[in-house]
Amino acid sequence: MPVSLLRALLVFSLLCLGLSATRAAHAAMEIEVVGGAANKIAIAMVPFQTAAGQPSPPLTQIVADDLARSGQFSMTDVTGAAQPVEPSQVDYAAWRTKGAEAMVIGQVVALGGGRFEVRFRLLDVVKGTQLAGYSYKITAAQWRATGHRIADVVYEKLTGIPGAFSSRIAYVQKQGKRYELRVADADGQNPRTIVRSLEPLISPMFSPDGTRLAYVSFEDKKPVVYVQSLQQGGRRKVAAFKGSNSAPAWSPDGRQLAVVLTRDGASQIYLINVDGSGLTRLMRSGDIDTEPVFSPDGQTLYFTSDRGGSPQIYRVAKSGGDAKRVSFEGSYNVSPTISPDGRYLAYISRDGGRFRVVLQELASGQTRVLTETTRDEAPSFAPNGQAVLYATVQGGRGVLGTVTLDGKTRARLSESGVDAREPAWGP
C-alpha cells in the first residue's frame, strides 16, 4: 500500500505527529524571507509617530513583515530620513531619490482608558499623491490585528489583489505527549489553543466562513470527524462510523463535508451533511480514495487515489461518475488543494526521495516545484490565492512555511522547540 494513502487510514498522520518529544516553548514564530520576485514595489515604512514618553507599538514592523512575506515589496531604507506624519510634510523628491515608489506614514494617539487612535496614510511617491487614509480606534490588544489590517489595505491598493494578512491559520502542535489544535494569525502570531488531547489530532480545515473547524480526533481510540465552533466552542461528531473516519473537506456553501470512511472495508469518499445526516457514497471502487477537496464552485471534487497503480490526483463530479486523472508528472502525487479561483492545484510530489510542494495550472497541466525542502506535506492556499501554506521538517521537528506562487519567496513560521504540523489556511 503506498505510504501516502495510509494517510487515509491515519497511519501516515500518526507517524507524522509521532516525532521525538519536545519541550514546550512560547517563543514568537520567526519569519525568514529567503527569496524574492522581480519588479517588487519599493515601499518606505516610516515609523508611526507616538507622543513623547509613549511606548512605540509594533505596527511598523508588523506591516513591513507582512508585505515582505508576500514577495511583492522591497523595503526602502528609512534610516536618518525625515519622519513625516501628514502628506503635507513629505518631501517626495527626496524619497524618490531614495528609490521609494510608495510610503506609509502614520501616528498613534493615546485616547486614555487603554484606547488608542491609529492614523495612517498610503502615499504614491512617484506621483506625489495620497492613495488611502484611514483611522482606527483600538485597544492595546489590537495592535497586531490593526497592523495586519493596514497591510491588507496597502497590498490591495498597490497590487489590485485583496490582502490575506488578517486571515488565520490552523495547525496541530505536539508538545511531549500532548496534542493541541491551534488557531493563529496568518503570520503564526497570537496562537490560541482550540482543543487539547493526549491522543492525535489531525486534518483541520476551516469552514468557508471561518467560524468552524472540521478535524479528526483519536480521543475515542479511533479516528472520528468533529466540527467545532470557534465562537461558542461547542463541537459535534459528524462522522463516527465503523472503521476509520478521516480527511474532512468543506463544501463551498458550508453545508456538507466530504469525508473518507472505511466502514465498508475500502477507503472511500462520502458526502455528509454537517449535522451528520444524509451520508452518501461518492463512488464505488476497490481502490484507496482519499484526501478529497471541493472545487470553488462545489461541482467537482479532487482527490488522491491509487487506482492507476501509484498515488495520483483525480477529479470526479459531485454527482458521481467516472474519475479522471489530473496529475501526470511523476509517479507519486498526493494531498491536493485548489486555489480560490480554481486555476491551480497545489500538492505534494515525490521526486528522488524528496517530498515537495508542486503547483499545477489546471488549464495547461504545467507544473512548477515551489519548495526546496524534502519532507513537505499538507499544502493549503491563502484566501487570496497568492501563497501556499505547508508543513515540512527541519532539525527533526515540524515547522510551517509559506511560499508564493512563483516559488521565489518562502517564509518560515518556526516556533522554537515544538512540532507544528497539519496546517490549514482559513478566512
From Swiss-Prot:
HAMAP family: TolB
Family note: Belongs to the TolB family.
Pfam family membership, one: TolB_N
One CC-aspect GO term: periplasmic space
NCBIfam families, alphabetized: propeller_TolB
Organism the protein comes from: Thiobacillus denitrificans (strain ATCC 25259 / T1)
Top-rank taxon, per record: Bacteria
PANTHER family according to UniProt: PROTEIN TOLB (PTHR36842:SF1), PROTEIN TOLB HOMOLOG (PTHR36842)
Record localization: Periplasm
Role played: Part of the Tol-Pal system, which plays a role in outer membrane invagination during cell division and is important for maintaining outer membrane integrity.
Gene Ontology terms describing biological process: cell division; protein import
Signal sequence region: 1-27
Self-association state and partner proteins as the record states: The Tol-Pal system is composed of five core proteins: the inner membrane proteins TolA, TolQ and TolR, the periplasmic protein TolB and the outer membrane protein Pal. They form a network linking the inner and outer membranes and the peptidoglycan layer.
The protein's name in its UniProt record: Tol-Pal system protein TolB
Transmembrane annotation, as ranges: none
Keyword ATP-binding: no
Keyword vocabulary terms for this entry: Cell cycle, Cell division, Periplasm, Signal
Keyword Transcription regulation attached: no
